Amino acid sequence: ATSELILSLEQAAQDSAESAGTAVATVGELSVDPSAVNVIPGLVEFSADIRDVNQVVIDQLVDSVKAKLQSLEESRGVETTLECTYEVPPADMAPVCRDALHGAGDSFNIETVDIHSGAGHDTMQIAAATDTGLLFAPSQGGHSHSPLEWTDWWDCAAATEVLTEAVYKLATNNN
């Protein structure tokens, strides 16, 4: 039943991403009891991280999980529970911060591009209290939060220059 649910969530996120472009769902923890190769587990607990830049899409994905759980209860005769242990709404970065980062990049002839982060960051918490922005150095192959992630030293140095200039301009109201 768990494998069906996880695959259903993956498919729902992929379908949503094809139309909206930013939905992501990840199952990062899985606990099976008993954990034996030849025993059907009596209890499975797992965590799912569902993200999108639009809260409506997140809500739709959660609703699809609820519907699949109900379907699995009926078809498989299992009991399920759904518990939301951590919920932070998507946060847009402040235009003043984004403009400062773009301006700093321009001043060093370093290309900057607006992207949506697929991962949760501290800025999601801070955005409720003040203006926030994020700066990412490019990772080879676009890999992020993965063992394949690698950023060249020169890209890290360039990002540091851009960040320093942007913070200076914001701190001195010189943007």
Say what each PLM segment does.
Residues 11-27, 72-83, 111-116, 172-175:
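Flexible, glycine/charged-enriched surface loops at secondary-structure junctions
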Residues 26-35, 46-53, 79-98, 124:
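A short beta-alpha structural unit
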Residues 112-161:
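Zn-dependent metallopeptidase/amidohydrolase metal-coordination segment
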Residues 19-21, 39-42, 74-76, 106, ...:
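A structural signal for short secondary-structure junctions
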Residues 1-56:
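Midchain, well-structured core segments that form catalytic/ion-binding scaffolds
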Residues 61-69:
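Short amphipathic alpha-helices in soluble, non-transmembrane regions
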